[in-house]
Regions:
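N-terminal nicking endonuclease/strand-transfer module with a His-rich metal-binding environment
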Residues: 1-173
Length: 173
């Protein structure tokens, strides 16, 4: 019986949690293969930088750290080696779009065909990290918005208010 393939895309507000979920044999009973084009450090840095950027922008809603595609494969793919199918598919996606990926190959509940969970970053990995050094002290209020002076983040007791941050001159940020 011919079935239709489908593709579903989701926005991921917690990329590390989702990676852990789709690649865990303990949580996924029909997991056949997993593959990564970047290590855990990349995904941790991506999540941290995305959250920082989101706070700085002051935008409402949830921060989107990455995206996930769920792709149902035609039944013919069950005849091939699962790890090979997953690696070929993931590497082709990486080559075509130039993004880092994590993928997992699962069976559907009826075990008639495979589907791939493909998590990818919208940001590209820089060849060298972009290290910034503050040329002067920078102050941020509780909402993450930059303020001009230290006076604007000092409470009545003369201390920096909780939630406010200071990046001192010469610090890496």
């Amino acid at each position: 019986m011919a079935r239709h393939s489908f593709i579903q895309m989701s926005k991921l507000p917690n990329v590390k949690g989702r990676i852990s979920y789709i690649t865990s044999h303990a949580r996924q009973e029909n997991l056949y293969a997993t593959y990564r084009t970047a290590d855990n450090e990349f995904w941790s840095n991506l999540a941290r930088e995305s959250q920082q950027e989101f706070k700085r922008s002051g935008t409402e809603g949830k921060c989107i750290e990455a995206r996930e595609l769920i792709i149902a494969l035609p039944e013919v793919y069950t005849r091939y080696e699962p790890q090979e199918v997953l690696e070929d598919f993931t590497e082709e996606f990486r080559r075509r779009y130039g993004v880092e990926c994590v993928s997992a190959l699962h069976h559907n509940k009826r075990k008639t065909n495979y589907h791939i969970h493909l998590i990818f970053s919208e940001r590209k990995l820089l060849p060298e990290p972009d290290i910034k050094i503050a040329t002067r002290s920078v102050f941020y209020d509780e909402t993450g918005k930059r303020v001009r002076t230290k006076k604007e983040i000092i409470g009545e007791d003369g201390q920096i208010r909780k939630g406010c941050t200071v990046i001192k001159k010469g610090e890496v940020y």
